[in-house]
Amino acid sequence: MPRVPVQTAADAPGESREALHELERRMGRLLNIHAEMAHAPVVLAAYQGIQDAITKHGSFDAKTREAIALAVAAVGKCAYCQSALTVGGRAAGWSLAETVAIRDGTAELDRKLAALLAVAREIAGSTGNVSDAAWQAAREAGWGDTELTELFAHVAVNLFTNYFNDYVQTEPDLPASPGLEGWSPLG
């Protein structure tokens, strides 16, 4: 059972309603995570602020963004996020099998993307600390200062949602992704 009840846009605090309507329009429905974030308008605004900055100023294409998100969700073992991001990954052009392989770290990716995901996994798994070897491999694969700095924003927003889902024990409202059947919010 979630620690914070799911609410509708009509029930949410006034400061959250516009954002919820926009999320509902963009996603086709209101997801439990967003309906829970809306209890505290600052939480929903913080999430949307990072997402909007990434959309407006980010340089990664949709497939790269979703691959980063899948890798981070897997490190955090957030089943809710992995299920949501599997849907997002499919929409960005990854096959179902590829989304699972990205999560598992077994995807056959080009050297450049593989190096970027290795850095993302290290950021997510070690409180931001990245080994010199992973950093250098990303540099040698063609990533520059701008992209490696931007990567941190992508990892941060995904850790934000991972932690939030675990914190409030978001109930599933998405189909389980392969390998996550029977999942609960606490995995």
Question: Model-predicted segments: where are they?
Answer:
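Hydrophobic alpha-helical segments
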Residues: 1-187
